């Protein structure tokens, strides 16, 4: 024995791998016997050391990692940012999920790596460290759970739980973490049980399929082989692993010298020589051909040389060794072991992290932007995708770094950006080879709140199937859930009202009878307009009506408009009025009165006469908000001031008005009458009882209040026509909105004014007492100044209203005197007496109380009782004659020393009254009056600016203020709504004499999918274009069910009409985009202001020809003077929709249409999809103020902001709009001059191909399914998932992407190769090439699964099994042979031999069998019957008369014979005389073989295209494995 001093002392810990290497070298050097002796000594030494060390494990030995705290904090911060982006709608749910998994996975992995170095540095002799890292007990992942963190877990359904487990077992888990980890532990227990059984069964099947494979012969005589060459990117380690233990299939030459001969087994020395040779001459070295079990020519056994060295002791495998069973167990055993690993880490979510390229130094990065295009990463961040390999330079201060980025990688920085050292600049996309196990997963997104669904125009609104409600997204877009409060009642109103708001009675309830359910999915969706209700009074068409509706199936209406109060959100649009937001003049800004609503009236046919009232608005300062009714009184400025300024103007225009009156009277008469009556029907239906009685009451309305002074009376006759008629008109027009009682609504109004004046107003006497109980009030007393203006005259047409300048009265101030009126049913019992004096809140009847205190007057009529309460004090004067009745007394001036100065600060109105039965007794009522000053500060005209690009036509807008109530007129209220006293009007005028009218139309402009409406007024020469022949009997009709017929659209118009309309340039804008496909153009409608557009004949049912590009820019000015940006560039993202005329008056709606609209009026918006169906929002919605967010804009930035903000637009949270951060995401609901209101909404980003559940406007409750994503998920490479994969490969099941790809490739090869080579060569060679390729591919896949778990299995074990799975071919039906049946499965070698023997071609195709099918297709029926389906197999074998030659192990075990391996092997070997001549034949054949090799290697080009070159042998493309075929 050598001296100790010379022994090498190797001070290094020894783990399992080192031990394997040591044993392998000992066997090489000393052989088996001596090695076992040495190992025995090592064992004794180990046990001795372990005993003396007495390692024990305590809780103090679990050292936590110091950096864990800030790592977790960092991950939490990233998660928080992620959550925020998701909330803003910047990323979608799947991206959030992926990123979340990767954040926590990366944190967990980093902690795992830190753990090793932490133990090694701080405490190398730590028992935990010693145990787990030596492999003695436990492993790294289990220790990681003790001292690291678990991360994200899966729930029982396999879905990720979003809360990661941050604590480890050393620190202790919180309650929530404990419950979540229990999920994982349960999953681990169940997995272990199930998967262990699976692994065991897999082992059984593997052994079953190869149990008969025994080494029976030294050499099978094959000269085929597989080429191995390190040139194809194979690592040296893999090269060595692949070659050692194999046998060469051909001689190896370097230059002309042979360094290794055929059939020589390869040891480590020979491999080193190969490597040296390759390094010396890398390009001239030939590939090395080795023999594998695939190349063995025997059918049911294997030869020594094809198997190679035995892995146990490094010599060639011995004859009689059962290598099949060893192979099956070698593959099955690691599976059984590895399933046990899942016990602790059960359910932990893992994700693959991508390969990253980092910057080598600080500097500016540059690359060619033409070679990249923008995209989104898997995590939703912006990036650039490389088309080709990209060259990137990073310029630091002194050096230029160059980085190559491979094809299909993602660049995560911008060009010319400054990057820091080690910053991630690119992500290498993982190869999309089939080796990645991916699965398609559905992810459902559920609504997080109640709300109503809204989507952008990118969704096709027609469902995917006719009766379904699923829709596919054609491109990535947002879905929005608009917040609402749900009220579950089916007839609840869509209410935005606060106390004392003006509201339309139609919206009190939506009548359920008219809601039709057309959707098969039971959603109250599409109320198709214009359905016949089948009742006579609601017929769709009356062919005798002079003006008929032309309906083109497309309803265009406008957005809900804005009124003056924040809460007053209801659109105040009746018939054709449009409300526009205005702002006060700068001087009044300090008052902070919010926006006014301007109402525009566009008359019949959209034609405005000169001096027509074009728009008006009601100033909230002149509004009486208190409930009740009363009288308005006013005074004028002195006559001289007024007359002096205006006299000349009147003279010049006098003639003009007269002629104008004659021209237009007849033209407009008939429609106007129709308009009035039609309007009346709609309005009086609700307030029927009151109106029926009030109408006659007002004809005989009597004066209860006192007598006006004499001077007021003289001019009464002159002014009643001029002053009254317009007022009546206005009152009627306004009535629907405010529920005023229409005082002058009488039949005579429709006749001539002159005849009716006497009847209507009667004559007034100072003390007339013939048949009246009280004095009659002088209703129409006018100031004396009016008489001078009388000669100007006021022209009032039935169709349009024009102003003479008389109406610009300069009223100083006016007064409102309060009183209260109650109209009670005749039968009601009164609780107060006539002429009594009551206080405030006195009970009048059972249900009504007084709001004012004062004198009560009761008047009983035929059908009802009127009760009036006059507020104020009552005095009994001594001398009645001295009282001046009806006078207004101004407030007293304050005197400093006067104590009574506080008494009267307001104006008072003095009225003279008399007692009933006495003609002499009078008393005086002194009533408070509210004074309103008139103000000239509001300048409307500036809000309708003249356009800069205007041509020579010049429209002028003038401002007129007038008072909406006559002097001393009783203004009564039934519904106690607000009274408006002053109305400001905008009057249209122009200078050109030849222009007869101005045409107003509404232009709808669609810019970038946002629609805005503008009002356009233009001068026209003649109105003939816009009038239609009244009694034209063409077949114009409504389309009954609102689905336009695609073909017969020609019946809409007669030729003449089309010509007359088409002379004008504008047409209804196209709804077809460039590709002529239907876009999803959804128009947000306010359903209570529908407008019918004209239809112009064309091939397309819902559109006319493309808009005429010659529309001048000046036609498109906004109401607020904002020119729409770049509207002149007509491109695919801009649509200009102009509508030919405005045809909207109430009388155009026939009854059934009106009914339908009333249904819609309770709801706020309507929508149209491609199929022209109107979808309504559900009626069960309440919008509450807290759903709305106000945003006030900085004054300077408003002009810029207007171009960006549009009504109906959706804005994401945190968007920066000109010094303004949006606090909440939502839809712009109201736009004011200095602010806008958002309706809160939550965005959800959805990708292409996602499925949207439900329809537009559908009401979703919290937790309803909103959208379903389908995305690809990489399956984690956990062995528990890996084992099923291995099983699938072995079973050749087409469950996921592996097998179909392979099967598809086999099909391709089966078809292509016979085509190239022809028949009969084709089938033989085609099948062989196909089988060779599929075998290599399968080996790679199985090895990948095991290598991912660190398990090393020698390739030859897998090869033996794959050989059995792929060794059959199926006889094809292409050529009928006499030997085999079509479809019969036979071995490849048998088919070749049969073909040779018969001298005829046999047609067959390669087939991939699974291990189970392969076990049931062997030569032994006893083996098959003992595996599965015993009865079927035995019956079939008996019928066929099969013979079992008992060659395998199993058959012999079953029958109790000697198994043919080991010592029992000798019996089964029969030497054949051919063996001796074998080598001789091979020498002769070699010549032909080398030529064939060139032909047959075509297949490497054919098949290597769809595989990726990776860095190792069995994971490379198939190119290196080139089988050699010799025939």
UniProtKB/Swiss-Prot annotation:
This protein's GO CC annotations: chloroplast; DNA-directed RNA polymerase complex; mitochondrion
Domain of life: Eukaryota
Known cofactor(s): Zn(2+)
Chain positions recorded as Zn(2+) binding sites: 220, 296, 303, 306
Enzyme Commission code(s) on record: 2.7.7.6
GO molecular function, one term: DNA binding
GO biological process: DNA-templated transcription
Location(s), subcellular: Plastid, Chloroplast
Job of this protein: DNA-dependent RNA polymerase catalyzes the transcription of DNA into RNA using the four ribonucleoside triphosphates as substrates.
Similarity comment: Belongs to the RNA polymerase beta' chain family. RpoC2 subfamily.
Record protein name field: DNA-directed RNA polymerase subunit beta''
Gene (UniProt): rpoC2
């Amino acid at each position: 024995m050598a001296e100790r001093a010379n022994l090498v002392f190797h001070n290094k810990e020894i783990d399992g791998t080192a031990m394997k290497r040591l044993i392998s070298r000992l066997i090489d050097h000393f052989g088996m016997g001596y090695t076992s002796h040495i190992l025995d000594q090592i064992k004794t030494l180990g046990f001795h050391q372990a005993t003396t060390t007495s390692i024990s494990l305590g809780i103090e030995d679990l050292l936590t990692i110091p950096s864990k705290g800030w790592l977790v904090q960092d991950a939490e911060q990233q998660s928080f940012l992620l959550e925020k982006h998701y909330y803003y709608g910047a990323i979608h749910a799947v991206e959030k999920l992926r990123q979340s998994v990767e954040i926590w996975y990366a944190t967990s992995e980093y902690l795992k790596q830190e753990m090793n170095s932490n133990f090694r540095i701080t405490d190398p002799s730590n028992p935990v460290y010693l145990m787990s890292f030596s492999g003695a007990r436990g492993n790294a992942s289990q220790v990681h759970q003790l001292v690291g963190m678990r991360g994200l877990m899966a729930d029982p359904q396999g879905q990720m739980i979003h809360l990661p487990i941050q604590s480890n077992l050393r620190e202790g888990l919180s309650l929530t973490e404990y419950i979540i980890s229990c999920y994982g532990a349960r999953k681990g227990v169940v997995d272990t049980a199930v998967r262990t059984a699976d692994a065991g069964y897999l082992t059984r099947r593997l052994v079953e399929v190869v149990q008969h494979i025994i080494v029976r012969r030294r050499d099978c005589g094959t000269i085929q082989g597989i080429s191995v060459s390190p040139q194809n990117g194979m690592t040296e380690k893999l090269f060595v692993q692949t070659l050692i233990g194999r046998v060469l299939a051909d001689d190896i030459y370097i230059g002309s010298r042979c360094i290794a001969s055929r059939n020589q087994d390869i040891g480590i020395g020979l491999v080193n020589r190969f490597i040296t040779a390759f390094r010396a001459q890398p390009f001239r070295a030939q590939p090395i051909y080795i023999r594998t079990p695939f190349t063995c020519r025997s059918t049911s056994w294997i030869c020594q040389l094809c198997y190679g060295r035995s892995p146990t002791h490094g010599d060639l495998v011995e004859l009689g060794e059962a290598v099949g069973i060893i192979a099956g167990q070698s593959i099955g055993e690691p599976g059984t072991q590895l399933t046990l690993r899942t016990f602790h880490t059960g359910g932990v979510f893992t994700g693959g992290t991508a390969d990253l390229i980092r910057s080598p130094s600080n500097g500016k990065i540059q690359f060619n932007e033409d070679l990249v295009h923008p995209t989104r990463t898997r995590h939703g961040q912006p990036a650039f995708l490389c088309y080709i390999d990209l060259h990137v330079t990073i310029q630091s201060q002194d050096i230029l770094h160059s980085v190559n980025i491979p094809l299909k990688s993602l660049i995560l920085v911008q060009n010319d950006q400054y990057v820091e050292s080690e910053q991630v600049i690119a992500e290498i996309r993982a190869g999309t080879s089939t080796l990645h196990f991916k699965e398609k997963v559905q992810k459902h997104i559920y609504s997080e709140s109640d709300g109503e669904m809204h989507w952008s125009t990118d969704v096709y609104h027609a469902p995917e199937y006719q009766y379904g409600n699923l829709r596919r997204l054609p491109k990535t877009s947002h879905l929005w859930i608009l917040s609402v409060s749900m009220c579950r009642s089916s007839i609840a109103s869509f209410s935005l009202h606060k106390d004392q708001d003006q509201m339309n009675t139609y919206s009190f309830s939506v009548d359920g009878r008219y809601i039709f359910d057309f959707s098969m999915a039971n959603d109250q969706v599409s109320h198709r307009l214009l359905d016949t209700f089948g009742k006579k009074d609601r017929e769709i068409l009356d062919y005798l009506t002079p003006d008929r509706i032309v309906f083109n199936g497309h309803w265009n209406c406008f957005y809900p408009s804005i009124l003056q109060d924040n809460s007053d959100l209801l659109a105040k649009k009746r018939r054709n009025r449009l409300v526009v937001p205005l702002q006060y003049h700068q001087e009044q800004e300090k008052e902070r009165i919010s926006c006014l609503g301007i109402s525009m009236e566009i008359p019949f046919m959209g034609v405005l006469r000169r001096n027509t009232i074009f728009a008006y608005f009601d100033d909230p300062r002149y509004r009486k908000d208190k409930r009740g009714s009363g009288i308005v009184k006013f005074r004028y400025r002195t006559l001289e001031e007024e007359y002096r300024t205006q006299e000349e103007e009147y003279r010049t225009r006098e003639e003009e008005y007269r002629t104008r009156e004659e021209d237009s009277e007849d033209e407009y008469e008939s429609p106007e009458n129709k308009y009035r009556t039609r309007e009346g029907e709609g309005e009086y239906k609700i307030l029927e009882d009151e109106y029926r009685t009030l109408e006659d009451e007002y004809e005989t309305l009597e004066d209860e209040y006192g007598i006006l002074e004499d001077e007021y009376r003289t001019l009464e006759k002159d002014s009643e026509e001029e002053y009254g008629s317009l007022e009546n008109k206005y009152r009627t027009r306004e009535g629907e909105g405010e529920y005023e009682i229409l005082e002058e609504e009488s039949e005579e109004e429709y006749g001539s004014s002159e005849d009716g004046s006497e009847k209507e107003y009667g004559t007034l006497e100072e003390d007339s007492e013939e048949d009246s109980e009280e004095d009659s009030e002088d209703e129409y007393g006018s100031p004396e100044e009016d008489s001078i203006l009388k000669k100007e005259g006021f022209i009032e047409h039935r169709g349009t209203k024009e102003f003479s300048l008389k109406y610009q009265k300069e009223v100083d101030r006016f007064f409102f005197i309060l009183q209260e009126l109650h109209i009670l049913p005749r039968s009601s019992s009164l609780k107060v007496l006539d002429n009594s004096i009551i206080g405030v809140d006195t009970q009048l009847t059972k249900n009504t109380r007084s709001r004012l205190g004062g004198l009560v007057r009761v008047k009983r009529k035929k059908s009802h009782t009127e009760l009036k309460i006059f507020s104020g004090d009552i005095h009994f004067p001594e001398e009645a004659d001295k009282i001046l009745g009806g006078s207004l007394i101004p407030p007293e001036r304050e005197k400093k020393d006067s104590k009574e100065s506080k008494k009267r600060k307001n104006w008072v109105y003095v009225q003279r009254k008399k007692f009933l039965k006495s003609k002499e007794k009078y008393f005086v009522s002194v009533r408070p009056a509210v004074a309103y000053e008139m103000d000239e500060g509001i300048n409307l005209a500036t809000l309708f600016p003249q356009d800069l690009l205007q041509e020579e036509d010049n429209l002028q807008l003038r401002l007129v203020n007038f008072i909406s109530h006559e002097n001393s007129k009783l203004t009564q209220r039934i519904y106690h709504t607000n009274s408006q006293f002053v109305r400001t009007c905008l009057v249209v005028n122009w200078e050109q004499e030849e222009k007869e009218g101005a045409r107003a139309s509404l232009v709808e402009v669609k810019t970038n999918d946002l629609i805005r409406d503008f009002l356009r007024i233009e001068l026209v020469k003649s109105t003939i274009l816009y009038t239609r022949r009244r009694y034209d009997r063409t077949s114009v009709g409504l389309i009954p069910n609102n689905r336009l017929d695609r073909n017969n659209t020609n019946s809409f118009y007669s030729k003449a009409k089309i010509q007359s309309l088409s002379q004008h340039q504008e047409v209804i804008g196209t709804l077809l985009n460039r590709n002529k496909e239907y876009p999803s153009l959804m128009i947000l409608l306010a359903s209570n202001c529908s407008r019918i557009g004209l239809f112009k004949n064309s091939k397309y049912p819902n559109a006319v020809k493309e808009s005429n590009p010659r529309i001048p820019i000046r036609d498109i000015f906004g109401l607020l003077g904002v020119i729409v940006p770049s509207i002149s560039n007509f491109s695919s993202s801009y649509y200009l929709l102009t509508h030919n005329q405005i045809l909207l008056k109430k009388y155009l709606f026939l009854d059934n249409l009106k009914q339908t609209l009333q249904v819609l009026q309770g709801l706020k918006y309507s929508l149209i999809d491609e199929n022209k169906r109107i979808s309504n929002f559900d009626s069960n919605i309440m919008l509450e103020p807290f759903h709305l967010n106000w945003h006030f804009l900085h004054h300077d930035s408003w002009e810029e902001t207007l171009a960006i903000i549009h009504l109906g637009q959706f804005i994401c949270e945190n968007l920066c709009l000109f010094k303004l951060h949006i606090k909440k995401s939502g839809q712009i609901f109201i736009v004011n001059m200095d602010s806008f209101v958002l309706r809160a909404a939550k965005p959800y980003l959805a990708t292409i191909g996602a499925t949207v559940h439900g329809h537009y406007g559908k009401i979703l409750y919290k937790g309803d399914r909103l959208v379903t994503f389908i995305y690809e998920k990489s399956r984690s490479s956990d062995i528990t998932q890996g084992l099923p994969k291995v099983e699938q490969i072995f079973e050749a099941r087409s469950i996921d992407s592996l097998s179909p790809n392979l099967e598809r490739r086999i099909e391709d090869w089966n078809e292509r190769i016979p085509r190239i080579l022809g028949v009969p060569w084709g089938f033989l060679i085609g099948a062989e090439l196909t089988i060779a390729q599929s075998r290599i591919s399968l080996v790679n896949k199985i090895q990948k699964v095991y290598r991912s778990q660190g398990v090393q299995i020698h390739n030859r074990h897998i090869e033996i099994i794959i050989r059995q799975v792929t060794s059959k071919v199926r006889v094809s039906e292409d050529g009928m042979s006499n030997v085999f049946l079509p479809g019969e499965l036979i071995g490849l070698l048998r088919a070749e031999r049969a073909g040779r023997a018969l001298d005829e071609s046999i047609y067959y195709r390669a087939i991939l069998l699974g291990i189970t099918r392969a076990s049931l297709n062997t030569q032994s029926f006893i083996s098959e019957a003992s595996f599965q389906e015993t009865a079927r197999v035995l019956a079939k074998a008996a019928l066929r008369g099969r013979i079992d030659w008992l060659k395998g192990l199993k058959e012999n075990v079953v029958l109790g014979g000697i198994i043919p391996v080991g010592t029992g092997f000798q019996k089964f070997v029969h030497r054949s005389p051919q063996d001796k001549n074998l080598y001789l034949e091979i020498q002769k054949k070699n010549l032909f073989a080398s030529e064939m090799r060139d032909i047959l290697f075509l297949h490497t080009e054919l098949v290597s295209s769809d595989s990726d070159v990776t860095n190792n042998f069995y994971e490379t493309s198939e190119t290196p494995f080139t089988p050699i075929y010799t025939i």
